[in-house]
């Protein structure tokens, strides 16, 4: 593991028990807890997968940069299998403790420890902004390598144009060195990695309070006002 990746891994090792607390401090002004945002994105991911595949229950899904596995209790019941990988061995140990049915691996931040075309869907949630920018193309290329042709790559990221998002990133202890990507940058990253039909949509334009408000939030998907966004690309053959 090179020094940059080791520094990232060591930083997140420190937050294996206090990750949620650190995020909650940063978003306290919103009146919401991290669980609400996690649930909203997990449900969005499940809807996204279901809209592209007829039988989600047969799919193999990989979470790249999975941390402590916050999204896996929502995902595991609706897909065939979930795997998670992260550079932080401490976070992976915590994730395995919380989600014993999920398969976890630690990696060095370079080559993912999986075979070519192993997964139907690969996703990452608010991960790329922790990756050094010179490694963004390599990160996307690895997600593409392990995803089968016709499969999906799904990326969730912070919207750097949203003022409250910038405040959260500034106030979050482990986001202080983050470099945020615009929607256009993420679209370009996936396209250059070998994805077609790359689409980006806003999410979390409204607070994730559930019910009607969550449904209403989807009507704003085509406007660039969400605090975060989703990028989806179909992996091409070759």
Identify the meaning behind each predicted range:
Residues 1-55:
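Conserved class I S-adenosyl-L-methionine
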Residues 62, 68-111:
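Class I SAM-dependent methyltransferase SAM/SAH-binding core
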Residues 123:
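A conserved beta-strand element that flanks and buttresses the S-adenosyl-L-methionine
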Residues 137-149:
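A short glycine-rich, Lys/Arg-flanked "PGG" loop and its adjoining helix->strand segment in the class I
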Residues 150-157:
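Conserved beta-strand signature within the Rossmann-like core of class I S-adenosyl-L-methionine
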Residues 159-176:
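Short, glycine-/aromatic-enriched active-site segment of Class I SAM-dependent methyltransferases
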Residues 179-194, 200:
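Short alpha-helix
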Residues 213-238:
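Core SAM-dependent methyltransferase catalytic element
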